[in-house]
């Protein structure tokens, strides 16, 4: 309701508006046909196009190391998409994961309100302190990103989306995230709880 009200205020009856940017939510494009919407979207993506400097990474952690075995015991393995190891290897991306995690509602719903950034020396302690479901991903600083065996397609999609946004940022200090009250409201909204339960089956 608040979002719809905000959109209405922003438009203010202007019938010429065909693009609406919703902070931390996405973009709404209006058009007389699907082709018109597609054309507008292409113009937007062309203007915002930027080079991505990150590439595939592989982890250096040996499978017979105690840390690797500990991760396996908890149900984790190296993530399937090697690009996503950068989230645990590149300082700028680690900072995004740590400080700008709650970028948009779906991300919080499917991946939680904060990320688990693993420490090589304290990983066992970190995992033992979790009193709820284990997180779908662990970002082991300087090593790589690990996925839990129960991770769903929806959760993979959300992390890929986060990565696509993160690698295109020049100054993360300017990035707005969802507030604590917005996150609380979101995670306790019955409709979102139901939607998340459906996604876990995919």
Residue ranges and their predicted role:
Residues 1-202:
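Glycine-rich flexible loops
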């Amino acid at each position: 309701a608040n979002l719809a009200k905000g959109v209405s205020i922003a438009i203010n009856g202007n019938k010429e508006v065909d693009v609406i940017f919703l902070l931390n939510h996405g973009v709404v494009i209006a058009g007389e046909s699907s082709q018109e919407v597609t054309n507008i979207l292409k113009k937007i993506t062309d203007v915002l196009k930027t080079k991505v400097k990150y590439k595939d990474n592989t982890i250096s952690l040996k499978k017979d190391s105690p840390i690797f075995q500990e991760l396996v015991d908890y149900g984790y393995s190296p993530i399937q998409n090697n690009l996503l190891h950068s989230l645990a290897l590149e300082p700028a991306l680690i900072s995004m994961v740590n400080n700008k995690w709650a970028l948009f509602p779906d991300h919080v719903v499917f991946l939680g309100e904060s990320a688990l950034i693993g420490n090589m020396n304290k990983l066992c302690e970190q995992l033992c302190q979790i009193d709820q479901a284990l997180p779908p991903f662990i970002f082991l600083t300087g090593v790589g990103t690990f996925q839990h065996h129960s991770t769903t397609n929806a959760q993979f999609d959300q992390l890929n989306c986060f990565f696509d946004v993160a690698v295109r940022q020049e100054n993360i200090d300017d990035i707005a995230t969802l507030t604590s009250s917005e996150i609380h409201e979101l995670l306790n909204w019955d409709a979102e709880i139901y939607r998340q339960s459906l996604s876990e089956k995919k």
